[in-house]
């Protein structure tokens, strides 16, 4: 065996037989190229061992594999489990992700920063008020202070009112049929709203910034962004018997009106 590992010419004359000899020879050879060259230049008795022949030729075939690291068969499932992304968390299954989350966050940050800059310059403006009032007409002063006030106060409040119901992520817990909606609060921190499917109320009239009401809170989602359409149907309650009967009655009434 030592002669075979060192590539000695005496290894050719040694009889190699049995499974242990073939496996030890395969482990002793340092690389596929060395094993192939040594196996091609040697000959000896061989026999079938689990689909491979013993001897140097069998060892060469055992080592004739790609140079990358091989993962044992019994590890493949574990490695595949670690590398497989999961959409489940302690909050439930992730069924929706808003594509405007970064834009909402960036616009609100910009609005807050401009408000802070405006508030920083207000003391300086007030100190220079006497000099400005003498040279600038009163209407222009009113317009100027109105613009400053809108940037510092009105714009952040308006943006928060518009985007407070925008859902960043939505989770669903199937066992309890509850949902968890993640939104931004006034301080740009993520806040959660937990509600049951029975708490979902669809507004009678269409609202630009409201898709449904969860208890008393208005939430905004984009139906197109649901990877599974059934999740949106179940969220809105469109799979309930009451809604199906209502739609059938509505379609029948419309059909009768068209016939008349």
Curated annotation (Swiss-Prot):
The chain crosses the membrane at residues 103-123, 142-162. It is found in: Mitochondrion inner membrane. GO terms for biological process: mitochondrial proton-transporting ATP synthase complex assembly; mitochondrial respiratory chain complex I assembly; protein complex oligomerization; protein homooligomerization. Residues 1-81 form a transit peptide. Keywords: Membrane, Mitochondrion, Mitochondrion inner membrane, Primary mitochondrial disease, Transit peptide, Transmembrane, Transmembrane helix. GO terms for molecular function: mitochondrial proton-transporting ATP synthase complex binding. Residues 124-141 are mitochondrial intermembrane. It comes from the Eukaryota. Residues 82-102, 163-260 are mitochondrial matrix. It holds the Pfam family TMEM70. One of its GO terms (cellular component) is mitochondrial membrane. It is a multi-pass membrane protein. Lower expressed in the heart than in the liver (at protein level). The keyword Lyase does not apply. The keyword Ligase does not apply. Its main location: mitochondrion. Homooligomer. Interacts (homooligomer form) with ATP5MC1; this interaction facilitates the oligomer formation of subunit c/ATP5MC1 (c-ring) and the c-ring membrane insertion and also protects ATP5MC1 against intramitochondrial proteolysis. Interacts with the core subunits TMEM126B, NDUFAF1, ECSIT and ACAD9 of the MCIA complex. Interacts with ATP5MC3, TMEM242 and TIMMDC1. Belongs to the TMEM70 family. Scaffold protein that participates in the c-ring assembly of mitochondrial ATP synthase (F(1)F(0) ATP synthase or complex V) by facilitating the membrane insertion and oligomer formation of the subunit c/ATP5MC1 through its interaction. Therefore, participates in the early stage of mitochondrial ATP synthase biogenesis and also protects subunit c/ATP5MC1 against intramitochondrial proteolysis. In addition, binds the mitochondrial proton-transporting ATP synthase complexes I and may play a role in the stability of its membrane-bound subassemblies. It is linked to Mitochondrial complex V deficiency, nuclear type 2: A mitochondrial disorder with heterogeneous clinical manifestations including dysmorphic features, psychomotor retardation, hypotonia, growth retardation, cardiomyopathy, enlarged liver, hypoplastic kidneys and elevated lactate levels in urine, plasma and cerebrospinal fluid. This is Transmembrane protein 70, mitochondrial. It comes from Homo sapiens.
